[in-house]
Every structure is written in structure tokens, then in C-alpha cells.
Amino acid sequence: MPIEIPTDLTPELVPLSWLIGEWEGRGRLGTGDEDSEHFLQHVSFTHNGLPYLQYRAESWLTDDDGTRLRPLTVETGFWALERKQLDADGGPGLVPADIVPALKSADEVEALRNSEGGFDISVSISHPGGISELYYGQIKGPQIQLTTDMVMRGSHSKDYSAATRIFGLVDGNLLWRWDVATGGEAGKGLEAHASAFLARVS
């Protein structure tokens, strides 16, 4: 399936452009074995002309046939190429970006390509319960690998120390896996948390 790049997309989002749209499908909690619970997920990646994608994922527990049982969770965040922020970029807060984007051409974006042939990315994701994740990783064509650099927890949040996520585009579908560590040293003891197979719906 060809990927259509929006005409108003800022150049540095082109490597992430295959994510843009809405996705929906089913997944399994844990290792995905016979006893793992099922869930339904709706994911959206949108853009507003600035150099990041807005991300939202809403999930529901389901029965084996896919009938919704009850809400599971919602997470929201931002995805962007990882680079130094320039004077032309917006922020912090309501400081506006320049009308002309910081990276104006494909050549300027190409200069960010890393030694492995991909692009470094950063992803921030917030969850209910006072937990926020900051991931760093790489996008290389239709494959994404992310590892938490930091997990921020409120004083009453549940224990959660690290995570990895992988995403891939396979035959036009979005596949992902999420592993987490809920105790001990960050990055140690990662266990399968969930995985899903999502089809593009718009």
C-alpha cells in the first residue's frame, strides 16, 4: 500500500509520515498466550504543521470475540525527530515558532540520518495514575525501536521503572509490542506487557 505524504507536512516529519492516520485492532495482554486477556485499541497520529506528531491510544478489554467489556486505559503523547532545539522552534510554553520551520528542506532532514541509516527519535507518553515516559530510539523505514530514558512517577503511582516498545509496518498494518519492568533497576527484568495488530481505518 503506497504511503501518502500530506502536502502541509513539515519536512522533518516525513520519516514518521507512515504513522499518520487512525489505526484500530486487537491485541493480547502479557505474553499473548492462551490465557492472556484480549483488548481492542484505537490509535491516532495527527499533525498540526509543527515538527511533532500528536499521539493518542485508547484501549478496551474485550471478550474472546472482540466484544467490548470495559475501558482499559488511554495514553497520549508526542513523537518527533530527536535534535537540538533551535531559535526557530517554538517553546517553552507559548513561545511561538517561526513561520518558516527550523528544518526547511529534505537535505536538512537527511543530515540528521544516523550511522545505522535511520533517524533518532524522542517520544513522550503520559498515562493516568501519574506516570509519564520519555523514550529515545530510532526509526528506520517502517521499523521503530524505543527504550525509556526516564519514567516519571507521582508520589502515589504504582511501581514502574522502565520499558521498551517496538513498532513495525507489515503489509499496511501496524504491529507493536510493549515490554515493561515494574520493579528493581531500570532496564532489568523487562517482561512482556502487551502486543497488538492494528489496521489503518483512515
UniProtKB/Swiss-Prot annotation:
Protein name per its UniProtKB record: Peroxynitrite isomerase
Residues noted as binding heme b in the record, renumbered to the chain: 193
EC number of this enzyme: 5.99.-.-
SUPFAM superfamilies for this protein: Lipocalins
InterPro entries (alphabetical): Calycin (IPR012674), Nb(III)_bact/plant (IPR022939), Nitrobindin (IPR045165), THAP4-like_heme-bd (IPR014878)
Pathway terms, separated by semicolons: Nitrogen metabolism
Entry remark concerning the domains of this protein: Forms a 10-stranded antiparallel beta-barrel structure able to accommodate a hydrophobic ligand in its interior. In fact, this fold hosts the heme group, which is located in a wide surface cleft.
Membrane-spanning segments: none
MF terms in GO: heme binding; metal ion binding; peroxynitrite isomerase activity
Role: Heme-binding protein able to scavenge peroxynitrite and to protect free L-tyrosine against peroxynitrite-mediated nitration, by acting as a peroxynitrite isomerase that converts peroxynitrite to nitrate. Therefore, this protein likely plays a role in peroxynitrite sensing and in the detoxification of reactive nitrogen and oxygen species (RNS and ROS, respectively). Is able to bind nitric oxide (NO) in vitro, but may act as a sensor of peroxynitrite levels in vivo.
A Pfam family that the UniProt record links to this protein: THAP4_heme-bd
Cofactor(s) required, per the database record: heme b
Source domain of life: Bacteria
Cofactor note: Binds 1 heme b group per subunit, that coordinates a highly solvent-exposed Fe(III) atom.
Quaternary structure, from the entry: Homodimer.
Family according to the record: Belongs to the nitrobindin family.
Catalysed reactions listed for this entry: peroxynitrite = nitrate
Annotated motif GXWXGXG, positions: 21-27
Key words, A-Z: Heme, Iron, Isomerase, Metal-binding
